[in-house]
Amino acid sequence: MSIKIRLIIMNFLQFAVWGAYLTSMGSYLVNVGLHEHIGMFYAMQGIVSLFMPAVLGIIADRWIPAQKLLSFSHFTAALFMAAAGYYGMTKGAEVDFGTLFTLYSLSVAFYMPTLALSNSVAYTALDKAGLDTIRTFPPIRIFGTIGFILSLIHISEPTRLDVIS
């Protein structure tokens, strides 16, 4: 498989993950009675984005290759998001804000740095393949946006149908 195809798949999946929860989270929080905390959940993404990419960037530059750190970060974020999902499914409408917020915060603390790490991995791979990153990367990156949009449409479709009926 060519490097471009692999990077297209990586970007598609990178942003499909984000689209899967970003736009539907507010509706979920309203449904479980945590509507007054929606802003805190969304703000946490910005807060962790201020320092976690720098921290993991330093780790990637000094000790762990970016590809391995990207994998570790995605896996760890997925574990915490799965734990948050499992917690939400088992508690139903009796979700505790502190527990859900902690699991979500830990998930985004590991997910948000993957945005920069995936770009670093892509640029390094393109350089190693002898390709011009300025010309080659933008058409690859657009598949991240496509992944985000398709994911949010797929996830929000049942919600949209519930509102219509």
Give short role names for the model-derived ranges.
Residues 46-54, 149:
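Residue-level signature of mid-helix packing/kink "hotspots" within the transmembrane helices
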Residues 105-140:
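Cytoplasmic helix-loop-helix junction between adjacent transmembrane helices
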Residues 1-49:
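Helix-loop boundary and gating motifs at the non-cytosolic
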Residues 12, 80, 94-115:
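Hydrophobic core of transmembrane alpha-helices in multi-pass small-molecule transporters
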Residues 62-75:
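Cytoplasmic membrane-interface "Motif A"-like loop-to-helix N-cap segments
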Residues 51-65:
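Helix-to-loop junctions at the C-terminal end of transmembrane segments
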Residues 75-93:
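C-terminal ends and interior cores of transmembrane alpha-helices
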Residues 153-157, 161-165:
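Single conserved hydrophobic/aromatic residue that forms the stacking wall/gate
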